[in-house]
Structures are given as structure tokens and as C-alpha cells.
Amino acid sequence: MLDVSVIVPARNAAPLLEECLAAIVRAEPRELIVVDGLSSDDTVAVARRHGARVLSDDGRGVAAARLLGVRAAACERVALVDADVVMGDGALAALLDEFAAGGYTGLQAGLHSIGGPGYWGRALAHHHRSGRSRRWFGLVATVFERSVLLEHGLDERFLSGEDIELRRRLARNGARLGVSERTVVLHRFEDGFAFARGQWLADGGGLARTLDKEGWRGAGLLALPALAAARGIALSVARREMRFLAYYACYLVFNYAGMVRRRT
């Protein structure tokens, strides 16, 4: 049995959660916690069927859900795993071993992103596989010492982007953060324009909130969506993948729309 508490935030995630939790259960962690965000589907039933301890964040969002799970966890190490992640056999144990051997403050698994059969799901996955963000530390499938998250916390006002704010805050405090190249997990994107648009708006809002907190230190974040879109467009043209141009145009527009919405 692995001495770790696995925390999975989930809201209306029943179709994804089944495979996610089955993989976690096979890894035999000491504790599995699912934090439900007032789901209207079978999320809670799926969690209980896999033996998870189920908590509710009362719909306060993913940052609040993660922190609630950390506070309730019994183990000294916690693994934050999103419902859209599937960990292969041995992946959790390997990530824990690398975390301990490398002296990390936080270590995220590498992500192999896949999307649904439609345009927007495939485009989201393509962006995350080819973009620089795949090497950025985040909270998608990540191991921490519980005490670190209790000390530094997560800003519960964030709907998205709290991982960027936490990463920058921990880095300023000398934390050792990393993304594993040895342990890679499956990261699944839902399909449809509505899902993609919601992601972009929430991400833009998260960047704006980080800017509000950091002031001049966060000024570089203003250029982040533009730089990512420009890189994606340039690569699409160079590789003759012109079908992705519409994706990057929408990514650019709705990220900045999310930033403006947050600041008005």
C-alpha cells in the first residue's frame, strides 16, 4: 500500500471519473478522497462505488476543493489528481519515488493530452502536446508534502489558474518544483466549443487575478496568451496544419476576454 492520500476534485465528471478512480484504486493508496462540487450527475455514486471518501466543497470551485481535501487528508504526502487524468499501472508509485529521491517540494507527472473526436477536443489536446505549457508545473497529477499546502494554501477565489499563482509564490520561496519526464499520465479533454470557451475564459480570469495579487511583478503575464497564440499559429503554418488557426484565434480572444471580465 502506498502511503499517500489521493485527492480528486470533481464536478459533473461521472463519465471521466470512472476510469480515473479505477486506475487510482489499482495503485493502492492509503486514502482516496473525492471532493464533489455539487454535481448533478452520478459523480458521487461513482466515487462511492470505488471506495472513496466523499466530501463536498459546496460548489466553491476547484481550488477550494483541492484545499478541502488536503485539510482532510490523513497522510503526510498528498497527490492531487484531476478527474480527467488516468494514471497507468505503477505511475503513482513511480511519481512518489521520484518525488522523494529528487527532494522536490512538488512534482507533477508528465501529461500526454488527448481530446474527443470533434475539432475542439482535438485542438485542445494538440495545443497542450505542442505548447510550452506541457513543461509547466501544475496541479493536474501532482505530489506534495501535505504540510507545504497547509502552510502556503491555495487561493480559493480562483476558478482556474490557481496553479500558476501557487507556482510563482512557491518559487519565490525557494521551492523545488518539477514535471516528471519518467512518469507520464493520460490527460483527457472534453469536446465541444462550449468546453473550450469555458476553459479560456476561466484561464484568463485566473491570469487577471494573479496580476491583481502580484502587481508589477506579474506584468509579464499580460503577454502570455498573445505569445502562446503567436507560437501556435507560427507552428501551425510551418507544419501546414492550417485547421488549427481558428483554434488559436479563439484562444487569444477568449483568454483576454476572461482577463477583461475579471477586471471590470
Language-model-derived ranges and their functions:
Residues 8, 30-38, 55-56:
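Short beta-strand/loop segment that forms part of the nucleotide-sugar
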Residues 57-73:
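Glycine-rich, basic loop-to-helix element that forms the pyrophosphate-binding segment
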Residues 194, 198-264:
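Non-catalytic, C-terminal membrane-associated alpha-helical segments of glycosyltransferases
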Residues 22-30:
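Short, acidic, metal-binding catalytic loop of nucleotide-sugar glycosyltransferases
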Residues 160-168:
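Acidic donor-binding loop at a coil-to-helix junction in glycosyltransferase catalytic cores
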Residues 78:
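Short aromatic/hydrophobic "clamp" motif used to bind/position activated sugar donors
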Residues 86-119:
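Conserved donor NDP-sugar-binding/catalytic core segment of glycosyltransferases
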Residues 23, 36-44, 85:
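A conserved acidic beta->alpha catalytic loop
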